[in-house]
Amino acid sequence: MPPSSAAEGSTKRKKGGAAPHLKSRSKNARKLKRSAEDAEIAQLEQGIQAFVSPIDLKQFTQLPLSDRTCRGLKRAGYTDMTDIQAKSLSLSLKGKDVLGAARTGSGKTLAFLIPVLEILYRRKWGPSDGLGALVISPTRELAIQIFEVLRKIGSYHTFSAGLVIGGKDVKQEKDRLSRINILIATPGRLLQHMDQTLGFDTSNVQVLVLDEADRILDMGFSRTLNAIVENLPRNRQTMLFSATQTKRVKDLARLSLQDPEYVAVREPENEGCTPRGLEQHYMLVELEKKLDLLFSFIRTHTKCKALVFMSSCRQVQFVHETFCKLRPGVSLMALHGKQKQAKRLQIFTQFTKTQHALLFATDIAARGLDFPAVDWVIQLDVPEDVDTYIHRVGRTARYTAKGNSLLFVLPSEEKGILEALATKNIAIGRIKPKESKTQSIQNQLQAFAFQEPQIKHLAQKAFVSYVRSIHLQKNKEIFDVTALALEPFAAALGLPGAPKVKFVKEAAKAKKAAAYKAAQQQADDNSGQVKGDSDDEQAERADKNGKVRTKYDRMFERKNQDILSKHYANLIADDASSEQDSSNDSDTSDDDSVSVATTDNDDAEDREETRYGRSAGRRKENRLVGSDTSDSEEDESDDEQNDSGLHKIKSETKRSVMAARGDGDDGFLTLKRADHALEDDGDAYGIGGDDTRITMEQAKADATENLSKRKLAMGQSKKALALAGKRGIGEKLIFDEHGEAHALYELQDEEAFNKQGDAKTQAQRWAEEERERMQQADAKDKELAKEKRREKRRRQKEREKALERGDAPDNGDEGGSGDDDEEEEETGGRAVLAPIDNRSDGYETPDFDLTTEEDEDDDDDADDDDDDDDEAYRAPAPKRRKMAPSAGVTSQPSHSKKSKLEQEEELALRLLAGDA
């Protein structure tokens, strides 16, 4: 066959398909391939079950892995295993739940990706089986990094893998989710697809992996993770990996782990959780000097790769913008959460490939990201906790490489952060900057802020965001916002003054209150140790200082506030009388002397009342007997005033009783003012100097004699009355059948109330009386409504009959004149049912009776009264079309007022005449 024809034949076979013998050969090949895979899978299952981890487990070839996975690892350059990989793979390959903890850069990504590939391969997972493995990452950059590693080591497998993160096209992701076997996602976007994407089924997931598990399980992703786990099957395999692994039972119970195996790479006791090749330093810096030292460090380290962490996105933006204008001589980049996903991915890739660069970033770059050859990690702000510090410094000194870290610490933060790092056995040394190489950039920043409003606005945002980040930190022993020098810090950012931040004042106030409370508690504790204090008193004092006492608490804690002075005086008088009866014969001389002395005191009081008016005497009496009128704010003062008031009442009452006794027995126990009136009595307000009764009006007149007109006007003003609670209070009286006045809402005493029966019986009686009264009133209303309906129906029928006869209704009772309507209006316009219309709905041809002009005038006069009743309810008659007079019909003269029937008859005649 010529070459051309051979070429054509080969082309035809490609278009038409393989030859029959080739089809059979490929079918046999696929069959052999499947049988070989089945044999390999069976061998792997046996090897996994019988595998015992040797002591010298160093290479991946020692593990019972599939040939495809081994080739992928070899192609990616992974031959030797790390400690965490050697300890965890032997457990995870058997299908057990694993909690893995190891230092940063120790190869945790391969420790969970290899079991994912092997488990799905051994279970013959295919495209029709759906989603089989789910890997959740806290950040987008870490998810991208995991996906790239999976592509390298799984290149020989036939699984379909997908990446689902925020910032991507959701519609494009929805179309491909149903065909994915291994999914790597961030929590937020994964939950969004679970809620919105049709056909996305997670009920058959075999493996769940949480990378940086402690970050995913904390409060930031708590609710999202709970919602995701609810949609996953319980018989899955779960693996958790992090540099700072959690052991909290609450977190582990949420994931429904089944007998998890905790795998941790034990470090020597003298080493911490940070990489071995990491040198850690800290520098004591004032807040306003941070940017100067950072810029000086960059100027002196232009041939290195560094990562600078800050606490907020606004700080990253401001420092990146201003330092780029200062041109330090090295490539500067910024990575923070306010950037678009495409920009974040571009910067992540660019910094990974660049040899000498400096990246300003927030904590989104602190976890899991593997930046190659990072020389320095600089922390411009102290991290929130030790775990964050470990993850930050873990971006350098990866695996066996070397690295350095530098932490800028404020003087107020030094003690707290060093103690926190010591709890994790992290040794950090202090270094001092060289003054000769320190360069100030404050003047340049001020010039930038003055020339460009955007830079000034960004500086203000950076200032506020930093202060807010310090204020929101939980550990107040390290982060004290009140200790920050805000004015110098604002000047260091180039601002003319510090922006006003409200929560700084609130924090200062709270700190002052906490210090005062601590001092008060300390004083109470010291006073509680004094001798003589009982346990009850100490407990009561602790209860008072332990909670805030409101005015209601003080009100309910008052004691002896309801003692009646008059009743108590009578009791004391009875005691005094019994004592006098027993000692009447032996103490006559003493009684006389006491009586004379008491009489002199009474005369002195009368003279004082005459000199200063009746009000002075009453004030003096109230001062002696007024224990029930005191309203103290503290319990101790209440008790003291009550006790003193009771002693004064007792002494004064005894003195009055002894003075009231005369020489004979007739004057025994005659009190001078025993039945004096109180302030509420209007008819007898007090007793005068000559034992005469004074009315309330006279007492008020005496009290207002010494007041000026201005004071009197002020006392009667609306404001004064409102403050006294007397404004708007009216006294309403009702008179009974005997002519006696009673208050409108007069209260009965208990005795009078019980005479009428108990409360339940009276309530039932009142309900029955009201029910009966309402029934009677209802019957009257119904009867009245029926009568009105009957009357209206009768008048309507009479009016219709009169119209049928052609007679005008009279103004009497039968015609239904306007007097009845007026009478209805005067009754109050009670609503009644509409009258029943008994006329037929069809049209009735009227009898046309032509009358003379005189008859029409008479009829008009007779119908005026009837038409007046309907004027208010009938609209004016519409204008009728003028028609030409025809032969045989005389034109009728126009009248100002015509009845409705006559107008209809006239219109009918005109229409008939026109048709004729």
Curated annotation (Swiss-Prot):
Which Gene Ontology cellular-component terms appear in the entry? nucleolus; nucleus; small-subunit processome
Q: Which family does the similarity line name? A: Belongs to the DEAD box helicase family. DDX10/DBP4 subfamily.
Q: Which InterPro entries match?
A: DEAD/DEAH_box_helicase_dom (IPR011545), Helicase_ATP-bd (IPR014001), Helicase_C-like (IPR001650), P-loop_NTPase (IPR027417), RNA-helicase_DEAD-box_CS (IPR000629), RNA_helicase_DEAD_Q_motif (IPR014014), SPB4-like_CTE (IPR025313)
Start and end residues of each stretch annotated as Disordered: 1-34, 519-554, 575-667, 752-916
Q: Where is this motif: Q motif?
A: 58-86
Self-association and partners: Interacts with the U3 and U14 snoRNAs. Associates with pre-ribosomal complexes.
Could you say which residues bind ATP here?
Answer: A102, R103, T104, G105, S106, G107, K108, T109
Q: Does the keyword ATP-binding apply?
A: yes
Q: Which reaction does it catalyse?
A: ATP + H2O = ADP + phosphate + H(+)
Instruction: Spell out the protein name for this chain.
Output: ATP-dependent RNA helicase DBP4
| Biased amino acid composition, Basic and acidic residues | 539-554, 608-623, 645-655, 766-788, 797-808
Q: Name one Pfam family in it.
A: DEAD
Do you know which Gene3D superfamilies this protein is assigned to? P-loop containing nucleotide triphosphate hydrolases
Indicate, by first and last residue, each region the UniProt record lists as having compositional bias (Basic residues).
12-33
| Keywords of the record | ATP-binding, Helicase, Hydrolase, Nucleotide-binding, Nucleus, Ribosome biogenesis, RNA-binding, rRNA processing
Role this protein plays: ATP-dependent RNA helicase required for ribosome biogenesis. Involved in the release of U14 snoRNA in pre-ribosomal complexes. Required for pre-rRNA cleavage at site A2.
Q: What Gene Ontology molecular-function terms does this entry list?
A: ATP binding; ATP hydrolysis activity; identical protein binding; RNA binding; RNA helicase activity
The record's comment about this protein's domains reads:
The Q motif is unique to and characteristic of the DEAD box family of RNA helicases and controls ATP binding and hydrolysis.
Q: Where is this protein localized, as stated in its record?
A: Nucleus, Nucleolus
Q: Which domain of life is it from?
A: Eukaryota
Q: What residues does the Helicase C-terminal domain cover?
A: 277-442
Q: Where is this motif: DEAD box?
A: 211-214
Q: Where is the Helicase ATP-binding domain?
A: 89-263
Asked if the keyword rRNA processing belongs to this entry, the reply reads yes
- Bias kind Acidic residues: ranges: 576-593, 630-642, 810-826, 844-871
Question: EC number(s) for this protein?
Answer: 3.6.4.13
